UniProtKB/Swiss-Prot annotation:
Protein name per UniProt: Homeobox protein Hox-D4
Compositional bias (Basic and acidic residues): 245-255
GO cellular component: cell junction; nucleoplasm
Family of this protein: Belongs to the Antp homeobox family. Deformed subfamily.
PANTHER family reported in the protein's UniProt record: HOMEOBOX PROTEIN HOX-D4, HOMEOTIC PROTEIN DEFORMED
Keyword Heme carried by entry: no
Organism phylogeny: Eukaryota, Metazoa, Chordata, Craniata, Vertebrata
Subcellular localization(s) per the UniProt record: Nucleus
Source organism of the structure: Pan troglodytes (Chimpanzee)
Amino acid sequence: MVMSSYMVNSKYVDPKFPPCEEYLQGGYLGEQGADYYGGGAQGADFQPPGLYPRPDFGEQPFGGSGPGPGSALPARGHGQEPGGPGGHYAAPGEPCPAPPAPPPAPLPGARACSQSDPKQPPPGTALKQPAVVYPWMKKVHVNSVNPNYTGGEPKRSRTAYTRQQVLELEKEFHFNRYLTRRRRIEIAHTLCLSERQIKIWFQNRRMKWKKDHKLPNTKGRSSSSSSSSSCSSSVAPSQHLQPMAKDHHTDLTTL
């Protein structure tokens, strides 16, 4: 019973694997597939072609114009075709590709023109644009305001006197508030200072001394004395005229 059921079931073919005839009738296989699955078209000594057939350079001479009438093209395998994006593979019958042509040489006239043009910058260097200078970046000089100004001494910094220099100057001021030219030169050489520095120090020291002793300024005192003398001179003639008028009146009465 078990054997008969096995024989009955063995007659049925699994629908998942239809026979080759159905594939051939439905057009699922191409000519190559029909040859593979048919098995009767080739002989027993037939060998399937490889993926990358090895060309035989001995049969075809180098530099031929094309394949001969008796030569057959190699069969293509399932790999990448020659000349595809992966690289160029020359077929046995195809000639080797020629090397690329060199670039044309420049004409001598054009080369001479390019060398004679100094304004044209070299190709590797970039053009340098001039820097933008704004008005607030420009420094105002005195020469631009007054063209006749030839320039003078710059603004002097404040002199820092040492303690020894101040002590010697105070001693000299205690004895002489005004210096002569000769004495000023001697003190300048002794204290390693300039005559101008000695002169300015004595001027400032005299102003301080007058302020401490509450003395009037010399310039203000001279102006006040001149004004008082002018007032006294204007009053004096009027005082002389009054006695003269009285004497003249007495003379008239006596007559």
